[in-house]
């Protein structure tokens, strides 16, 4: 395909236009008074959301340079979402501010590489300041406040805090759709481990990239499964029972994998293959944990069991299994409660007797998975559109709460970033590096200004006032009051705030140091087919 090339200022400005198109659509959602964005879908009802990364993913621009600019900012939102689960809009607003200020200085003759070094040093200083001022999350109320802000609903925050209280920091919280109105919290015995589906063809929900199995059988194998003849007798029994199958093995490959995939695509048999978690003896132990949880047996030559002769009675069962590309969650395994208690007691004894910190940590993880269980938040709404939007907000808030517990919280509403700016005064930078640090200083006020703007206030006046208040005090955009934000429950996880800044700065530095952009040349639309009557087109009938 032919390429088109832009250089210098033309290249950078093309990228900036794309960034601005995307950022302008995303930033209207920031803060408690932010608005929603409606996203058209090719199939089904439109989606209404205020989630930055969901909006960013939907934006496709026509101009090739603008398209690349937008894609770079999508990366900021996506990376922040992956790391922290929230802060995607803040990251986009920061990226826009950094690029705008940076390009202004590049156009005025500043050295882009000097600016890049200055930005990186400034971000490092601000990140250290944020981590230094973070307060540990100690109470259920603090978790509720943080999650409530992320979801834009205090009742959701309280429910998430309740769920975390029940399953602990290590426990698993999932969100499901409900047929009834309102929110419900259900605690179910369950387990999650960090291995996803072996092939993307197993996915049953393409939009969420998940494979969901209801009431499945669970086959646990201590070795590789590669030949279909080993698997066939057992598969036939499972198909006769009319249930889906989850296979957890050292690996599933070759004709065994292709047989499962082909049957899934044809719709004759629903299954998912997953690699067993861990390595060596740890893998054996975790497979045994899953066997006890699901009421099955690990099929292994060590215990005299083989796939060819295995019956359906050796399979485990569960109410539901959800598999993503990275992890598997087993909900309500059919294992015997007494056997699970015995296994938990055995692991606790191993923890007490272990001399190795690493082994102890791994045993604690296994204990949390066996004993912690899974909290299920069931969300209901009047329409499918509202239900999707609500479910998405709750999922974001759960990740937000976990981030808060992990690294602590800082004042929300963009205040922590603005009040971290004095950390830049301690940097002894000169020339373009000093200019780079100043670009970061200007950008730090951007999220607060956008929140104020969305709340109908004058951004410059609000930023000036907040910069002169004592640390932690700022604008509560919901009430319009200036107060101690942590005391008022307006807090952000420091992990979210620092990730937003770090990812925004990373992309901004790439923007500034770009000197040429190579893009695909837009293809011209094919000419309409000629008149089959041949040369009669001018006649009027």
UniProtKB/Swiss-Prot annotation:
Keyword Chaperone: yes
CDD domains: GroEL
Any one biological process term the GO annotation gives: protein refolding
Pfam families to which the protein is assigned, alphabetical: Cpn60_TCP1
This enzyme's EC code(s): 5.6.1.7
S-S bonds: none
Subunit structure: Forms a cylinder of 14 subunits composed of two heptameric rings stacked back-to-back. Interacts with the co-chaperonin GroES.
Function (record text): Together with its co-chaperonin GroES, plays an essential role in assisting protein folding. The GroEL-GroES system forms a nano-cage that allows encapsulation of the non-native substrate proteins and provides a physical environment optimized to promote and accelerate protein folding.
PANTHER family in UniProt: 60 KDA HEAT SHOCK PROTEIN, MITOCHONDRIAL
Name of the protein: Chaperonin GroEL 2
Native species: Nocardia farcinica (strain IFM 10152)
Name of the coding gene: groEL2
